[in-house]
């Protein structure tokens, strides 16, 4: 099997995916932005070949892909890659474009809106009967002001397409709303402010979309507290409430998540779970390592084993 891994250098702990894939006989071809020799020796030795490219430049990416395919052919690996993986929301669009161009199974261009746009996620949540925060994508400032009057303050202003807490604002009054909107060019959503705890339903699916691992995080604070520089915290829960599991497992097939990690965020209000957004990637940073400790196992190895077995 030949797997193209986008950005093998970041985050650093994700090198364990590549090392485990390599140990199970998967040929991993890397396309990233860092210098090859800036990566750890263990990662370098696990890559069959590595091409460096500016991943935000389409021409540079194509040159990198051409180099990899040429080397792949020279090594006796004819044809395209079998799979493409990024494990990083930043490169999900690139992953879909490569799959589309080379006819590789996986996320395609048509799948990206539901995996990246919060307004479309919200429609899917509502369509399957889950409660959502009141609000909508705003078309212009007049509609935004009318909607704000209906929802009341405080409210949340967040980008329709964004990663993590970037670009999210808590708006206390009309003047603040006007000020924020005057600096915004991209599509944004306005939603009512929800006062609730934030929990997650996280996991890994196999090739058929079956959940083969599940876990949950409990946040001590919300993402806005992190944006404000507060010393926030979160922890892994070994016990997943039945209603949270049911809501999470309802969403997995609706978003067609196959052979991938997922990270779903919910508001918890009593025993009600309100979805916030979904992410078709592992939870960020060192959270996978936390989850490994919580289950006394190795998710990097489990992922590699699932991929290698097909």
Language model features with spans:
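Short hydrophobic patches on amphipathic alpha-helices
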Residues: 65, 69-72, 148, 181, ...
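Active-site nucleotide/adenylate-binding loops and adjacent lid/helix of ATP-dependent enzymes
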Residues: 117-195, 206-208, 234-246
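ATP-dependent carboxylate/phosphate-activation module, predominantly the ATP-grasp catalytic core
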Residues: 192-257, 261, 268, 275, ...
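Helix-loop-beta segment of a Rossmann-like dinucleotide-binding subdomain
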Residues: 102, 162-163, 228-232
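A short, flexible beta-alpha/helix-coil linker loop
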Residues: 105, 161-164, 281-284
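A short, structured active-site edge motif that brings together acidic residues
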Residues: 108-119
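ATP-binding N-terminal substructure of ATP-dependent carboxylate-amine bond-forming enzymes
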Residues: 1-110, 142, 309-310
